[in-house]
Structure formats: C-alpha cells, structure tokens
C-alpha cells in the first residue's frame, strides 16, 4: 500500500473530500486556499483562491459542478469546480466549522462557532443552482444551540436530507428534522466509554451505501457506529489516542479511524510515540486489524474513495497521503465470514 504523498498546503490539513465519481480529491487546510487533485495519480488540478484565513471545511455537490468552503474568515464561498471561480460569498457572524451540500444539492448546511458572544448555530441555505451568482444571503432554516446543550461541532445530512445529525462539544449526538429544524432526539455517544475528560465530537461520516447509519469520532479516544432512525449506538471502537476523524469503507466491513496525541503533548516526533497512524477496525467484530503509518503528526481528516479502492488522509504535518488498497486488504476475512460466504455460495 504505497501512497502518493501530496504537498500543496503550507499548514495543517483540516478536511479532504472525494467527489461522487471518485476521480477528484478536494482538500483544505489552515492556510487560505483549497486544492483539487486527480485521485488517480495525485496531480494537482488547481486551487480555489479567495479566503483570508483558515479553511475548516469543504464539500462538493453530487454533479461535481459546485464546491463550497467554510472559513475562519467568517465567510462561506461557493465555487465553480470547472473554472475555480468564486460565484458567491455568504457573510457569517462567526467562523464556519462545517459546510455540507444536501444529497439533492438543493440546500447547504453550515455549522458556525460559538464565539464573540454569538450562539453557535446550524444554518441551512437554499441553493440556486440555475443562477449561482444570485443566492439568498439569508438562511432558510436556523437551528441555534438548544438551552442547556453544548455547542455543535459537526453536522451532516442523512439519506434524502430527511434528518440533520449533529455532534456536540460534550459528546452528545442530536437529530433534527431536515425540513423544519425541529429537535427530534439525542444520545450521549461519547464521554461514557472511559474516563477521558474531553468528549468533543470531531467527525461524522455516513455509511456510503445508504446513509442509514453513521460513524463518529471523538477526543475521548473512541468512535461510535450509530443508527440514524433510532440513534442506537451499535458499535464502539476504542483507540489509544484522541480521534479526529472516522470513515466507513464500502466493499469491506471495515472502518478507518485517525487521530493522535496533539503535538504539544508528544515528547518526540516518532509516529509510534504520538500514535499518528490510520487505524483499521472490523466494523462488525470491532477488533483492530491493522494500522497504516506515514504521517508525522495527528491525522486530522480521512476520506474513503467512493468505490472502496483506497482512502486519503490529511495530517497536522501538512501532507495528504493518497492510498490504494492492495490484494491483502480485499482478501482479509475472519473464519466466520469465510464460512458464511461458503454457505451462501452453496445454497445459490
């Protein structure tokens, strides 16, 4: 599994994201430009220039027509992927931590920070796909932080945009109606599996096949697999370092976790000391089955290729590593899985 090492950012990576076809990889970092790469060979296709601060998040619509970025400069920018032109800028009251297109590309979700006396909010904007330069600056839906709840740190859409799933600073995961913003339910997903004091939810990524469940990561060194409809915690994956990101793989029943000790807490730069590896767990049996080294700092973001043929990781070290899975990855099976497959083959 020899990766491409992509060097295009001057500072730590904050998010990497594949387009739906998987031929392009988008990346943002604590510098002020976004990059677009060919996923097949790691060649840089171009950049989106215009932000004045850290870009925390990026997303691309299902047609690879528009990309959107959210920044610490208090703006969200809408870009034409083909030309790199910024066609619209949304002015926000506080830094933007997350931006996500709805599954049908008709809406844009953002998570803004709870700073400068402002209440952290989830805002939803209607996207004018026909006239990209004529967007509404006012959100069609605003979900403020609930009374008694900690601020939202991450959010995303369930299948069909039916629900908005949000992660909070205290390890809570909440579910809201995607159309009305009405609060439906919540579950304490983190801060209950060990004695860790910091429970902040750092990532939410949905199952690639149907978005009927999702995975979280947290500073409490755990990751949870949660059902969208019931918010049942189905699986818990325990690591030995704070986790910044987690993803679910298609094709194989695996999940990938990434994180590591923060640089100021590590006495040497050795990756084993800081636990700077991507960790692979079996999705069903929850065992850790392998690690991939390479970064010289915590992994901040992981995205799995839509075809399940590889993954990309972005680190605190400023590098993106683009991995393609080899034969041993596809061949790995537990005895129980092999037996089940053999029985199924014998009955068809």
Curated annotation (Swiss-Prot):
GO terms for cellular component: eukaryotic 43S preinitiation complex; eukaryotic 48S preinitiation complex; eukaryotic translation initiation factor 3 complex, eIF3e; eukaryotic translation initiation factor 3 complex, eIF3m; nuclear periphery. GO terms for molecular function: RNA binding; translation initiation factor activity. InterPro entries: eIF3i, WD40/YVTN_repeat-like_dom_sf, WD40_repeat_dom_sf, WD40_rpt. The keyword Protein biosynthesis applies. Its main location: cytoplasm. GO terms for biological process: formation of cytoplasmic translation initiation complex. PANTHER family: EUKARYOTIC TRANSLATION INITIATION FACTOR 3 SUBUNIT I. Component of the eukaryotic translation initiation factor 3 (eIF-3) complex, which is involved in protein synthesis of a specialized repertoire of mRNAs and, together with other initiation factors, stimulates binding of mRNA and methionyl-tRNAi to the 40S ribosome. The eIF-3 complex specifically targets and initiates translation of a subset of mRNAs involved in cell proliferation. This is Eukaryotic translation initiation factor 3 subunit I. The gene is TIF34.
């Amino acid at each position: 599994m020899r990766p491409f090492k992509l060097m295009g950012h001057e500072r730590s990576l904050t998010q990497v994201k594949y387009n739906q076809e998987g031929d392009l990889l988008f990346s943002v970092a604590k510098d002020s430009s976004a990059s677009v790469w060919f996923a097949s060979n790691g060649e840089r296709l171009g950049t989106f220039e215009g932000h004045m601060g850290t870009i925390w998040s990026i997303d691309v619509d299902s047609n690879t027509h528009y990309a959107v970025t959210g920044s610490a400069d208090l703006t969200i920018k809408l870009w034409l992927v083909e030309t790199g032109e910024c066609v619209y800028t949304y002015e926000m009251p506080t830094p933007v931590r997350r931006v996500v297109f709805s599954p049908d590309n008709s809406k844009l979700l953002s998570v803004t920070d709870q700073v400068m006396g402002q209440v952290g909010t989830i805002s939803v904007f209607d996207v004018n796909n026909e006239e990209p330069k004529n967007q509404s600056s006012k959100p069609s839906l605003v979900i403020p932080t609930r009374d008694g709840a900690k601020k939202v740190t991450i959010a995303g859409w369930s299948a069909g945009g039916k629900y908005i799933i949000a992660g909070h600073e205290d390890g809570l995961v909440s579910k809201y109606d995607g159309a009305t913003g009405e609060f439906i339910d919540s579950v304490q997903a983190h801060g209950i599996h060990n004695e860790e004091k910091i429970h902040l939810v750092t990532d939410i990524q949905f199952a690639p096949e149907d978005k009927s469940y999702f995975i979280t990561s947290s500073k409490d060194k755990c990751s949870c697999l949660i059902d969208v409809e019931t918010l049942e915690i189905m699986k818990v994956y325990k690591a030995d370092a704070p986790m910044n990101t987690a993803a679910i793989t298609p094709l194989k029943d695996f999940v990938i976790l990434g994180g590591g000790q923060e640089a100021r807490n590590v006495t040497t730069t050795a990756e084993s000391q800081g636990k700077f590896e991507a960790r692979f767990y079996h999705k069903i049996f929850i065992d850790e089955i392998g690690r991939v080294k390479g970064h010289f700092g915590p992994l901040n973001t992981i995205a799995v290729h839509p075809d399940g043929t590889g993954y990309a990781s972005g680190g605190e070290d400023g590098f993106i590593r683009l991995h393609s899975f080899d034969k041993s990855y596809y061949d790995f099976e537990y005895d129980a899985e092999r037996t089940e497959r053999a029985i199924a083959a014998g009955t068809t």
